[in-house]
Design a protein with these regions (language model features):
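Conserved catalytic/acceptor-binding region of the Class I
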Residues: 131, 135-195
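A short beta-strand submotif of the Rossmann-like class I SAM-dependent methyltransferase core
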Residues: 114-115, 123
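A short, conserved alpha-helix within the catalytic core of class I
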Residues: 120-130
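Conserved class I S-adenosyl-L-methionine
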Residues: 1-43
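Class I SAM-dependent methyltransferase SAM/SAH-binding core
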Residues: 47-49, 55-101
């Protein structure tokens, strides 16, 4: 994938990170799921579409509530991982499709979510598509969760990625997306939380980011990995990383 608005047009492919995503990126905290549930996301017998679902972490986190869930992603590798991880959930269906090419009936979904991904889409197409697919007074929610660079461990890892991949702009597209509203009457919420990691799981989390396996060539990645492991060897086996979670949601009237 290439996007002139992201990483100075540098190509990236989350399919290359699918196994790391499956193993290391399902780190969303219970507090997030509690907030999503309080908004009615995942409620029994509702119909919920998760855009850019990746390995399906968010749908799995609320699948027991009884919604009928469809997760879509452009990456076949990510969807393969999602299916493997979701075998026990008969109420989740996954499909490979660019969001811009989705075809569902009008007024089909009670809820549409876009977690860690809305800035990758073409809003000129996707905004109208959301309006078409969602039911009157349906809920559309965008989610962004990131480590905070004032956390010393996160700062060092982030700086190392930038050293090996100068085109990577980190979460800048997401920050801009937080300020951009395509629907009326946005409701915004956020909270900070310390998430637990081991040296292995933090290394895996960083490998899965857009700036590492998704876009580095093999030799660059090998040099990055060697340098990152050296940093991690100076840390205790277990530690926490400060994160911030941003929620923006809209009731879509028609």
């Amino acid at each position: 994938m290439e996007n002139v608005r992201i990483d100075n047009g540098q190509s990236f492919d989350f399919g290359k990170t699918a196994s790391e995503y499956a193993k290391y990126r399902d780190i969303y905290p219970k507090e997030l799921y509690d907030r999503l549930s309080a908004l009615g996301i995942g409620k029994a017998n509702s119909v919920w579409l998760d855009l850019g679902t990746g390995t399906g972490a968010i749908p799995r986190g609320l699948a027991d509530h009884g919604a009928n869930i469809i997760g879509v992603d452009i990456s076949s590798e990510q969807i393969e991982q999602a299916k493997n991880l979701s075998e026990e959930y008969k109420n989740i269906t996954y499909m490979v499709c660019p969001v811009e090419k989705l075809k569902f009936a009008d007024n089909f979904f009670d809820t549409i979510t876009a977690c860690q991904c809305f800035w990758y889409f073409n809003p000129k197409i996707v905004v109208d598509k959301i309006r078409q697919m969602i039911k009157p007074n349906g809920l559309f929610l965008k989610l962004y969760m990131s480590y905070l660079k004032d956390d010393p461990i996160a700062k060092e890892s982030h700086s190392l990625v930038k050293e090996f991949n100068p085109n990577w702009v980190g979460g800048s597209p997401a920050v801009q997306d937080l300020k951009t509203h395509y629907f009326d009457n946005p409701i915004m919420d956020s909270f900070t939380i310390d998430l637990p990691f081991t040296r292995e799981s933090w290394h895996g989390r960083i490998k899965a980011c857009r700036g590492v396996l998704a876009s580095m060539d093999t030799k660059t990645f090998e040099r990055f990995e060697e340098a990152h492991i050296k940093i991690l060897q100076q840390l205790p086996e277990q530690f926490t990383i400060k994160h911030k979670v941003f929620l923006t949601y809209y009731i879509i009237t028609k």
